């Protein structure tokens, strides 16, 4: 006779299907993710589930709309000792924020569009941003506006390109053109000086000095000539093996990635011309997978992430490391992508404590990939007045003044992601404790009926700030594979200082299969490291 063995997983990621949860997966991790203590030599690996960071109010620009972009450049105003500032795109305006949280409007963008930032590099550091209609510039050291002239379309008469993405590789500024297959680029460091000397051209011919040897030069505005070489000719290229549109570009190190609806190409600088041309790297064309969501591209730790599409995997999430393109989304997430229009989805990333996260939202869920553990989890916020779940409030993230600062998906607020803060702030006054939920896969024991006498969880207890009441966790049990759940059962996590307390529930009834869902919304950390189920297998069928 086989030994009675119960199979369950209380510490893990998300693997959830609404279509057939009892067959395809019921596991959920909401506002919590898997961690392993692997530091030190000869240390046993122990996996546990820890809380996602709290959402702490930081600053505000308004109560409506949402953030359209964040950026922290490498330098700042010379008058303030080159202090790094935060740049925020909100409600059609771009603001510079200093360490004292003073706001200064420094530019505009097309209202309602997502903003992509880049920095020119070189001695004259210029912050640039594109919005799908135009390009804008700002001198980071002097605080002056820099006017930059867009290239004209190669395939149309007297029309300027409409860049949605911008990248800088080895000093060369690169733009895509919405609706076109062409990519436009500059010479190296074209904005390094306010004025630039170029060849004097009259009626298409280079002019010479009186000695008939020395080429005549003329001085021009570097912003006007940004995307022209010394002959006044535009620099551009298009896909060498694909004819689809270039809907986005991205750069990681020396590699430039071009994304089309049905292809991904990798380009790098060549040395065949005086200003270096671009050439497609060999063996790197991917014609079976393209880009579904132009603004889903985000990078962290030399890895790129995006929502792709194509005959290889249909709609899916892709991770690009170097020139390797790999699908990372599980089947349940592929179905979510397939069932929704995701063309306007925005992706963003951040990294903390050896974890690199890629995040994007669809409806009221934010799907998060942890590149360290290769697991997915979900992040959600709550409505302050009703307590019902809604989309995750943070959007975009930057590292500024030793903080992870984010924008907001529903207002002009800025937040800090703080791992030692266990609330969600809605503004400077209103907040709710962070809700964390862990739902197990289907629990079975040799696929026979069983009775659960006790569920005990090893977690941090005695962590409440006040002595007046204990922290409480809530348990719900589903006996139909995760479709519906029964009554809510409370259990104590101990009062302040009761560190030896154990979280447990007794007499959970008879089951053929069940799903356990634990919720915790106290303003303390909640870390689950292990669990135990005391049960008895039955011979009587249900």
Residue ranges and their predicted role:
Residues 1-122, 288-303, 309-542:
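Beta-sheet repeat architectures centered on beta-propellers
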Residues 61-66, 103, 107-113, 145-346:
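Beta-propeller and closely related beta-pinwheel folds
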Residues 79, 87, 95-97, 128, ...:
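Assembly/interface hotspot detector across virion components, adhesins/toxins, and nucleic-acid enzymes
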Residues 89, 98, 131, 139, ...:
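Acidic surface patches and DE-rich sequence motifs
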Residues 116-151:
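Hydrophobic or amphipathic alpha-helical targeting/insertion segments
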Residues 143-144, 183, 188-190, 414-415, ...:
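Short, glycine/charged-enriched secondary-structure capping and boundary segments
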């Amino acid at each position: 006779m086989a030994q009675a063995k119960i199979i369950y997983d209380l510490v893990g990621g998300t693997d959830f299907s609404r279509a057939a949860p009892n067959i395809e997966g019921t596991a959920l991790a909401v506002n919590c993710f898997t961690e392993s203590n692997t530091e030190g030599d000869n240390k046993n690996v122990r996996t546990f589930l820890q809380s996602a960071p709290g959402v702490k109010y930081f600053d505000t620009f308004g109560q409506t709309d949402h953030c359209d972009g964040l950026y922290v450049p490498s330098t700042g105003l010379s008058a303030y000792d080159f202090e790094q500032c935060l740049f925020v795109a909100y409600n059609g305006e771009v603001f510079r924020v200093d360490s004292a949280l003073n706001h200064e409007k420094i530019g505009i963008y097309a209202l309602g569009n997502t903003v992509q930032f880049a920095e020119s590099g070189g001695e004259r550091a210029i912050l640039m941003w594109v919005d799908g209609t135009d390009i804008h510039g700002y001198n980071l050291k002097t605080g002056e506006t820099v006017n930059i002239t867009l290239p004209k379309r190669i395939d149309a008469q007297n029309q300027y390109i409409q860049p949605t993405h911008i990248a800088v590789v080895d000093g060369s500024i690169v733009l895509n053109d919405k609706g076109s297959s062409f990519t436009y680029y500059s010479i190296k460091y074209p904005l390094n000086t306010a004025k630039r000397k170029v060849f004097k051209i009259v009626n298409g011919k280079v002019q010479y000095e009186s000695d008939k040897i020395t080429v005549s030069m003329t001085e021009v505005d570097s912003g006007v000539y940004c995307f022209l070489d010394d002959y006044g000719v535009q620099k551009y290229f298009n896909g060498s093996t694909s004819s689809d549109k270039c809907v986005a570009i991205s750069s990681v190190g020396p590699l430039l990635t071009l994304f089309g609806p049905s292809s991904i190409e990798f380009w790098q600088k060549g040395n065949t011309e005086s200003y270096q041309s671009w050439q497609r790297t060999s063996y790197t064309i991917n014609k079976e997978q393209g880009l579904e969501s132009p603004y889903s591209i985000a990078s962290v730790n030399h890895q790129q992430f995006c929502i792709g599409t194509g005959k290889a995997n249909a709609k899916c999430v892709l991770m690009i490391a170097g020139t390797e393109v790999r699908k990372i989304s599980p089947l349940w997430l592929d179905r979510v992508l397939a069932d929704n229009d995701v063309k306007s989805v925005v992706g963003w990333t951040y990294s903390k404590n050896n974890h690199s996260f890629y995040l994007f939202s669809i409806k009221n869920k934010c799907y998060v990939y942890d590149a360290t553990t290769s697991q997915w989890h979900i992040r959600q916020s709550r409505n302050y007045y009703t307590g019902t779940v809604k989309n995750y409030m943070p959007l975009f993230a930057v590292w500024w003044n030793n903080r992870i600062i984010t924008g907001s998906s529903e207002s002009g607020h800025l937040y800090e992601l703080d791992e030692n803060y266990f609330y969600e702030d809605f503004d400077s006054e209103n907040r709710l404790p962070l809700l964390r939920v862990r739902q197990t896969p289907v629990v079975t024991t040799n696929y026979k009926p069983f009775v659960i006498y006790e569920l005990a969880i090893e977690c941090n207890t005695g962590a409440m700030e006040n002595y007046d009441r204990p922290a409480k966790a809530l348990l719900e049990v589903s006996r139909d594979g995760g479709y519906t759940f029964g009554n809510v059962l409370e259990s104590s996590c101990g009062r302040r200082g009761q560190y030896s307390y154990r979280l447990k529930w007794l007499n959970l009834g008879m089951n053929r299969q069940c799903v356990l869902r634990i919720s915790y919304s106290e303003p303390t950390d909640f870390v689950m490291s292990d669990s135990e189920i005391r049960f008895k297998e039955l011979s009587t069928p249900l």
